């Protein structure tokens, strides 16, 4: 093990990484709050500024994947599809099996220049998660309670608001509604059998309302749907904590592009199209498990230096005064001051750990265990 690899495993560095992310995030959120004054004057200027502010925060997480853990991401697709990346609005459909699936998605967004403007249909609880939810609020992210009767008007209004977005955006949909677990899968397949739908081996039954509504509201804005099927080599089950400890993973993503005009206008037909898509995704996962790769040409988009430079800039600005302060605390010789400082460090580490816990499968939402039994 090299020195750098050894240092990545040391707990003492992790609070420093967390400190940079949290404090820079609070600064960014404050600046975002100030930009609200621009909305009545120039909505598009407000949006462009917030895309760049969000990039400065999200790219720190992408940096952990790309530069800290050196995780590699390989695309399986075709040249024509790759040439369109970052040059059109798109809806992204991604399987929700892994703790860092969102991070792999963000990595691709970063490499094709749409990280700051990326969107997601997110559960309402995330709005109240510090930094993440607050940043999303200023980005006009569409939040839902996952109760369609209550969500319909909110989701439609939020999607239509994005029709004049000034920068290319990728709108992420987790059509399964919740992260895959064996328990949720069993309940989901019971519902599939009751509805006469084919059983899926690697996915939950997709929820069609969000997809059909997004496609309907974003017609004329979005050019295509990108279906992304993600898996990891070596049957690995990566985690954000693993990334923080410098573990390297190899992510493979099969990407298929569907022009939006190929998706039916009728809601029922669009729902059937989505169910068929998930049957195809299941077949792709079966191929991957048998052959260790997806079909299609392989592309490895080069990582860009901006995520690393952004983090190093924030680290230089924030850690220099922190180190001076720490030296002053210990130089004072005051037991009370030292204990207070150590208590603060412990509380901060706990807070960062709670943020990481948002991504953990075993601590994920119970949504889906029983909700699959209800009609959409």
Curated annotation (Swiss-Prot):
SUPFAM superfamilies: Glycerol-3-phosphate (1)-acyltransferase. InterPro entries: Acyltransf_C, Plipid/glycerol_acylTrfase. Converts 1-acyl-sn-glycerol-3-phosphate (lysophosphatidic acid or LPA) into 1,2-diacyl-sn-glycerol-3-phosphate (phosphatidic acid or PA) by incorporating an acyl moiety at the sn-2 position of the glycerol backbone. Acts on LPA containing saturated or unsaturated fatty acids C16:0-C20:4 at the sn-1 position using C18:1, C20:4 or C18:2-CoA as the acyl donor. Also acts on lysophosphatidylcholine, lysophosphatidylinositol and lysophosphatidylserine using C18:1 or C20:4-CoA. Has a preference for arachidonoyl-CoA as a donor. Belongs to the 1-acyl-sn-glycerol-3-phosphate acyltransferase family. PANTHER family: 1-ACYL-SN-GLYCEROL-3-PHOSPHATE ACYLTRANSFERASE GAMMA, 1-ACYLGLYCEROL-3-PHOSPHATE ACYLTRANSFERASE-RELATED. Its EC number is 2.3.1.51. It catalyses: a 1-acyl-sn-glycero-3-phosphate + an acyl-CoA = a 1,2-diacyl-sn-glycero-3-phosphate + CoA; pentadecanoyl-CoA + 1-(9Z-octadecenoyl)-sn-glycero-3-phosphate = 1-(9Z)-octadecenoyl-2-pentadecanoyl-sn-glycero-3-phosphate + CoA; heptadecanoyl-CoA + 1-(9Z-octadecenoyl)-sn-glycero-3-phosphate = 1-(9Z)-octadecenoyl-2-heptadecanoyl-sn-glycero-3-phosphate + CoA; 1-(9Z-octadecenoyl)-sn-glycero-3-phosphate + octadecanoyl-CoA = 1-(9Z-octadecenoyl)-2-octadecanoyl-sn-glycero-3-phosphate + CoA. The HXXXXD motif is essential for acyltransferase activity and may constitute the binding site for the phosphate moiety of the glycerol-3-phosphate. The keyword Membrane applies. This is 1-acyl-sn-glycerol-3-phosphate acyltransferase gamma. GO terms for biological process: CDP-diacylglycerol biosynthetic process. Residues 1-124, 340-376 are cytoplasmic. Keywords: Acyltransferase, Endoplasmic reticulum, Lipid biosynthesis, Lipid metabolism, Membrane, Nucleus, Phospholipid biosynthesis, Phospholipid metabolism, Transferase, Transmembrane, Transmembrane helix. The gene is AGPAT3. The chain crosses the membrane at residues 125-145, 317-339. It is found in: Endoplasmic reticulum membrane; Nucleus envelope. GO terms for molecular function: 1-acylglycerol-3-phosphate O-acyltransferase activity. A motif (HXXXXD motif) lies at residues 96-101. Residues 146-316 are lumenal.
